[in-house]
């Protein structure tokens, strides 16, 4: 990768879904691209970056950035998910985190439906606050989730969140307001 090291594939070609890559981050070219993106007002997305890449973006930018389709590592230990420290840093900067519906990032194979999405959302809310919450389903890139198969199922997710006690104001932020704010 010319820009930076992804979170699952190391520069030597090896893969690790369990050990975060804390050493390999943005390349020299990647730093230049991120700088130019900031100058142009473009959004930087850290969802596929290594842990080191995330911190390279955080430490070398001043504007909000996002994780368009990522979850909480404290809920499901997967290198694609964000640590609590990452969630805090991204949210303090004014960024958003779109919860991913990919079963691998949500939890165990038999527990990766709406309840798992809610667990990740609750953790993100607890650590990063209501202004970082967003949906990043990844419907166009995942093999499927038995309970959330497409946009038609968002009503089911909203109903489940309401049943779990989520207030309409926070649901509005999650479903559209935070993303609108971020991109304005």
Q: Language-model segments: which ranges?
A:
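Mid-to-C-terminal alpha-helical segments outside catalytic/metal-binding sites
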Residues: 149-184
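Short, solvent-exposed loop/turn segments at secondary-structure boundaries
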Residues: 77-79, 109-112, 145-148
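Glycine-rich anion/phosphate-binding loops
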Residues: 114-116
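Short acidic/histidine-rich active-site segments
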Residues: 100-101, 128-151
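Extended, charged catalytic domains and RNA/DNA-binding interfaces, predominantly
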Residues: 1-104, 118-125, 132, 153-156, ...
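Short, internal active-site loops enriched in acidic
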Residues: 50, 139-141, 180
């Amino acid at each position: 990768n010319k820009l930076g090291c992804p979170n699952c594939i190391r520069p030597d070609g090896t893969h690790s879904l369990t050990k975060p890559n804390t050493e390999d981050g943005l390349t020299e070219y990647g730093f230049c691209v991120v700088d130019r993106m900031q100058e142009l007002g473009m959004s930087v997305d850290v969802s596929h970056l290594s842990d080191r890449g995330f911190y390279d973006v955080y430490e070398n930018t001043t504007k909000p950035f996002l994780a368009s389709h990522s979850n909480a590592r404290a809920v499901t230990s997967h290198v694609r998910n964000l640590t609590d420290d990452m969630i805090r840093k991204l949210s303090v900067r004014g960024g958003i985190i779109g919860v991913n519906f990919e079963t691998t990032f949500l939890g165990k194979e038999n527990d990766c439906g709406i309840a798992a999405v809610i667990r990740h959302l609750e953790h993100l809310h607890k650590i990063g606050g209501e202004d970082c919450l967003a949906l990043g389903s990844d419907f166009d890139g995942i093999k499927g989730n038995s309970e959330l198969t497409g946009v038609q199922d968002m009503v089911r997710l909203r109903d489940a969140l309401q049943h779990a006690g989520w207030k309409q104001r926070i649901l509005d932020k999650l479903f559209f307001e935070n993303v609108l704010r971020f991109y304005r």
